[in-house]
């Protein structure tokens, strides 16, 4: 998409300098565990993945291209000469390095990315020295994924001039004046530079191994330990912490919502939009200043074992003195993603609707309870809403299907060795609900949603209503 811009930068006299110098951005080094993980992941993918492929120089070239595009998706950071040099040096050796668990190439490429990003943001800051003359015509490509990399620094400068103009005009359209625009963008670009200093080896490894995994199959992913933990929490709809949703605003962790009944809400001393400026462990652990930290690092400090204590230094939304609040961590259920029942009156009849956002662990048991609740409301029909449901646990979809059929197979799965396993209804000869049913789907209904809808259609248990589904005919398995 091309957007027309109006504007021209006047000449700069005194360029705004970054608050962080380039020598402060240090590339993290991979640990021995990172190398071991790389070797194990490579062995697992080459030996056991359903899609058979050969990890050779040709495939390594594809991994290289995907890695570059994941690092610089808009083609505005690297120069074409960078790509040519990196390709010549590393593209054909990635296969050998993956087999050996070596990460030299992956980290060297990322090192150059950090350097180029710093240079680009430094240049962007320099453009804020003088107010641009917003007259004349210019244009910017919003989507540059298929555009060529800039050949020269001058070409890159033009791309970033257009980007900065675009951001200036957007702020002008919000009735911002130049001094405020300059301050806003200077803060934005300096925060972007600061984030470069917070890069972790786990981040680099996850991006690199995902460039490998996604080249094999669009649904194969590598998760770092932190990402794997978050995935498990989302599948179980529970975590151990204080029950607050956090976001980063102007380098400060801000509370966006509170889970009813969780420790933060129970304290009645924390409110939405309060800021967390410090975190301490236990009754007497030192309070660490967390301003400027990565959000995921702050979250890790706040989460902890059920029953343990965490102390938060809170800056109230309305200002004033900060206060220290001690909370006892507890198990928190993520209710937003749980199945929910509503009963609507349609043409004088009570129709129950069970909305299932995802096939999480424990879903079937939750739906059992909702079906029992539904009976008490004398519903004459049931709608299972799977719109936007991207899937989840294979075990749960098999067990959930069993609530609505008496017996029989639900789905069959073929593995990498051509072995076929038929997954049967685990509760043969029984069904919890045998009344009228409809299943609602759309183009984002995928995986487990498709298995459920197809099974109920095949058994003539439900009318399927909606759009053609996503079409994901594979089953993922988690391996550590």
PLM-predicted stretches and their roles:
Residues 23, 29-30, 46-56, 194-201, ...:
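Cleft-lining beta-strand/loop regions that shape enzyme active-site pockets
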Residues 36, 40, 58, 62, ...:
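Extracytoplasmic/secreted proteins, especially bacterial periplasmic and envelope-associated proteins
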Residues 13-15, 183, 199:
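Boundary at the C-terminal end of the N-terminal hydrophobic targeting segment
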Residues 1-12:
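Bacterial N-terminal signal peptides
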Residues 55-61, 67-140, 193-248, 309-311, ...:
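Extended, small/polar residue-biased N-terminal targeting/export presequences
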Residues 53, 69-70, 92, 99, ...:
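PDZ/PDZ-like domain segments forming the peptide/carboxylate-binding groove
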Residues 17-26, 38-50, 89-93, 187-191:
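Acidic/histidine-rich, surface-exposed loop or edge segments in extracytoplasmic proteins
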Residues 30-72:
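N-terminal-proximal low-complexity accessory segments that begin disordered
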